[in-house]
Every structure is written in C-alpha cells, then in structure tokens.
C-alpha cells in the first residue's frame, strides 16, 4: 500500500451564505450558516481518503476545544489516520467563509496550526520517512514546510506542494518539491516577473496551474497542455482546490500520468462544487469513475 502523509492545517469552517457582501460599515442579512470541518491540509487528506483504499495520515494540531474534538471525529469517519494530530493549548484554527455569487471570501485564524513548528515534528520524522508521498500547503509556518521539503528531498520522498495561500517565501520551496499546484493568482505571486507560458516551460511536468472555470494548464516537456474544466451548477466552491490536490495526489499514487492525474482531479473538483461544504461534496472513487464514463474519458 502507498502511504501518503498530509502535513498541514486543520480548521473549523464557519460558513455564511449571502446574496451580497456588505460594504464597510454596512450590515446585511445572511441566508444560511453552518460549521463544517476544513483547513487545506485536512481537506486534502479527506479528498484523498474518499478516493483511495491506501493509507493517508494527517499530521497537524487542533486545540483543546469542541471544534478540535469534532474534527478528530470527522477524521475517524473519513478513514484518515489522525494519531499524529496533536492537541495543543491553543484554539483550533478557524476559517470565516462568506459564500456569494458562486464564489467565496475567506479569513483564516490559524490558532493551533501556528504551533506546527519544526520542533513539533521532533518525534514524527521517522513516521514521515515511511511515506511515499507528502502533501504540503501554506497554512502552517513556512519554516516547517521548508524543513519537511528538505527532509523529503534527502530521503527520496515525493512532495506535492500547494502554495496556498500565497506568501513571499514560497520560492524557497521550489527546489525541494516535485509538484507545485498554485492557482493563477498564487502563480503570479510566486513568479511576478515571468509570463505564465515561460514559467510552465521552465518547470515542465512539475508546475500545474489551476485556472478555475478555465481548467488547468501545464507543460509536458514538449508542448503546453490545457485541460478544460467541466461546467457545473455551482453550490459551493470552497473545497474545489483541495479536492483537486487530493485527487491529483491519488492519481499519482495510482501511477497515472500527470495529464491523466489532472483529468481525474478536474472531474473530482467538478463533482465537489455541486454540494455544500469544503468536504461535503468531495466524491468517492465510484462517483468519479461514473462521471469519467459519462464523459467518455478512459483513464484506467
């Protein structure tokens, strides 16, 4: 069995749906509110687990509070191993999410996620060493990500790095990771002075840029490849990127090519945005296979 470790953020999403966002000093009525488990790391672990029979382990931290307890129960229900999720004397991270007009705005309060420092991993390096693939994002401290990426490079462990949300230090990671999956905005933050095609060619078969409703673009070493998105009735886009990353990682562990892994991930993302919650719409493999068959896309 392929072992995947996701090292990253674990949060509770506080989600409000409204028909418009208030201006400064204005109050508007919302249409709905919910609390659902989230955090980019946790979301990507759940997305992978929904698709794969292989072991996926979450490494991170929650607080000593009701949100933390609820999140650990959610990992259990989704077959994500969580023995390496610590409980720390901090509040569990939260994300305040406003849904409107088929899009979202998010404010993150890291809480316990900021406690996932290199020192926090002191007893976990051997566990990480057992992994065939490690998935990272940007909702834990940069120095932790960099330490993990360097460790994985030294130990021939593949790393999928999702540089979200973007930060100036992300470029330090590039030489130590195998796959980079920014969206278009994050890509511009990473490479502000280079044209997209130039960047993709430089990092062929490593840089995969998601373009929302425009699909996904990458360079295969010979030509630029663009894989279109699939039209859908949008309910909630919050977990689309995390679903993409979890599904892309699954494709890689299934020994699919990069392009076929992307196609699978695009289908998974398409299905995810048709239900509420970052994790609520994440599909099972049977759902993805049914959609692939409907679209006459043969990956297996």
Swiss-Prot record:
Provide the active-site residues from the annotation: 242
Sorted alphabetically, the keyword list is: ATP-binding, Carbohydrate metabolism, Cytoplasm, Kinase, Magnesium, Metal-binding, Nucleotide-binding, Potassium, Transferase
State its location(s). Cytoplasm
- What family does the entry list? Belongs to the carbohydrate kinase PfkB family. Ribokinase subfamily.
Activity regulation field = Activated by a monovalent cation that binds near, but not in, the active site. The most likely occupant of the site in vivo is potassium. Ion binding induces a conformational change that may alter substrate affinity.
Enzyme group, top EC level? transferase
| Taxon lineage | Bacteria, Bacillati, Bacillota, Bacilli, Lactobacillales
UniProt keyword NADP, yes or no: no
Q: Which residues bind K(+)?
A: 236, 238, 272, 275, 277
* Residue sites binding substrate per the record: 11-13, 39-43, 139, 242
- Name the residues that bind ATP: 183, 210-215, 241-242
Q: Which GO terms describe its cellular component?
A: cytosol
Cofactor(s) this protein cannot do without:
Mg(2+)
- What is annotated about its quaternary structure and interactions? Homodimer.
Instruction: Specify the protein name.
Output: Ribokinase
Q: In which pathway does it act?
A: Carbohydrate metabolism; D-ribose degradation; D-ribose 5-phosphate from beta-D-ribopyranose: step 2/2
């Amino acid at each position: 069995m392929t072992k995947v470790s996701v090292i990253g953020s674990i949060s509770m999403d506080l989600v409000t749906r409204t028909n418009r966002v208030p201006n400064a000093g204005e109050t508007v009525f919302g249409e709905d509110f919910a609390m659902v488990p989230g955090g980019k790391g946790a979301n990507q672990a759940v997305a992978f687990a929904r698709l794969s029979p292989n072991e996926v382990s979450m490494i991170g931290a929650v607080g000593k509070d009701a949100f933390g307890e609820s999140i650990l129960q959610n990992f259990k229900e989704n077959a994500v191993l969580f023995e390496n999720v610590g409980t720390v004397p901090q509040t569990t991270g939260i994300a305040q999410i406003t849904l409107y007009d088929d899009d979202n705005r998010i404010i993150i309060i890291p809480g316990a996620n900021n406690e996932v420092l290199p020192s926090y991993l002191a007893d976990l390096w051997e566990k990480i060493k057992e992994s065939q693939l490690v998935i990272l994002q940007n909702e834990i401290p940069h120095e932790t990500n960099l330490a993990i990426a360097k460790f994985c490079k030294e130990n021939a462990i593949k790393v999928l790095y999702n540089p979200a949300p973007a930060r100036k230090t992300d470029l330090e990671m590039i030489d130590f990771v195998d796959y980079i999956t920014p969206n278009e905005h994050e890509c511009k933050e990473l490479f502000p002075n280079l044209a997209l095609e130039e960047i993709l060619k430089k990092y062929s078969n490593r840089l995969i840029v998601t373009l929302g409703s425009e699909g996904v673009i990458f360079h295969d070493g010979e030509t630029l490849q663009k894989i279109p998105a699939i039209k859908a009735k949008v309910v909630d886009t919050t977990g689309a990127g995390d679903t993409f990353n979890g599904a892309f990682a699954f494709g890689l562990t299934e020994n699919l090519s990069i392009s076929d892994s992307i196609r699978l991930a695009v289908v998974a993302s398409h299905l995810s945005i048709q239900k509420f919650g970052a994790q609520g719409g994440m599909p099972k493999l049977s759902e993805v296979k049914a959609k692939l068959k409907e679209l006459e896309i043969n990956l297996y």
